[in-house]
Swiss-Prot record:
The lineage of its organism: Eukaryota, Metazoa, Chordata, Craniata, Vertebrata. This is Myozenin-3. It comes from Homo sapiens. Signal peptide: none annotated. Residues 67-110 are annotated as: Binding to FLNC. Keywords: Cytoplasm, Phosphoprotein.
């Protein structure tokens, strides 16, 4: 659990989060099951409720510690900017009455002026001036500049073909494979195909074995409308007394 002395300043800093949040009235159908669920999760004799409470405590502890550590880091960075002292990477948490509760330090050693590539004196420069700028050779000696004295690698001249040659080309060019690629297997004379294709409206069967009975053709009797349609029409287009003259450019 979080001590009361540590929780107090954090809750004071996070006062806006502790204010009552306006809740939406979801009605009786939704609010009653939610209240029952929270009541079941607050029980002590249920394994699921115990796991839920343990998780809530863990989340609360993480939230308080995260807020406290962020405030401490901001305060420490502001203090270093004002005073001008650079203690390398020191983070202190001063929320409790006893002072700092925990401390994490990271020391970066700057490179010495006489450090060489991979030399023993440049590997761990313990004593360095305070005003020296840290360099990468302090963390990884030997990688501060490109390696010297190493001959450049020769270019690997690999024969790369200009085109692609299919491995089946020699078989395709053979005289037996110069056809169009279709199967020319001769089918026997008495071969019957039993694969039936669905043909609508009683189409012809592919594998029919017995002849269909012949149906005599009976012409459909003509109806009265058909007889009227076949009657000759004596309607003529009305023509005037003057014969049609072709149009000319003079008109």
């Amino acid at each position: 659990m979080i001590p009361k002395e540590q929780k107090g300043p954090v809750m004071a800093a996070m006062g806006d989060l502790t204010e009552p949040v306006p809740t939406l009235d979801l009605g009786k159908k939704l609010s009653v099951p939610q209240d029952l669920m929270m009541e079941e999760l607050s029980l002590r004799n249920n394994r699921g409720s115990l796991l839920f409470q343990k998780r809530q405590r863990r989340v609360q502890k993480f939230t308080f510690e995260l807020a406290a550590s962020q405030r401490a880091m901001l305060a420490g960075s502001a203090r270093r900017k004002v005073t001008g002292t650079a203690e390398s990477g020191t983070v202190a948490n001063a929320n409790g009455p006893e002072g700092p509760n925990y401390r994490s330090e990271l020391h970066i050693f700057p490179a010495s002026p006489g450090a060489s590539l991979g030399g023993p004196e440049g590997a761990h420069p313990a004593a360095a001036p305070a005003g020296c700028v840290p360099s990468p050779s302090a963390l990884a000696p030997g990688y501060a500049e490109p390696l010297k004295g190493v001959p450049p690698e020769k270019f690997n001249h690999t024969a790369i073909s200009k085109g692609y040659r299919c491995p089946w080309q020699e078989f395709v060019s053979y005289r037996d494979y110069q056809s169009d690629g279709r199967s020319h297997t001769p089918s026997p004379n008495d071969y019957r195909n039993f694969n039936k294709t669905p043909v609508p409206f009683g189409g012809p069967l592919v594998g029919g074995t017995f002849p269909r009975p012949g149906t005599p053709f009976i012409p459909e009797p003509l109806s009265g409308l058909e007889l009227l349609r076949l009657r000759p029409s004596f309607n003529r287009v009305a023509q005037g007394w003057v014969r049609n003259l072709p149009e000319s450019e003079e008109l």
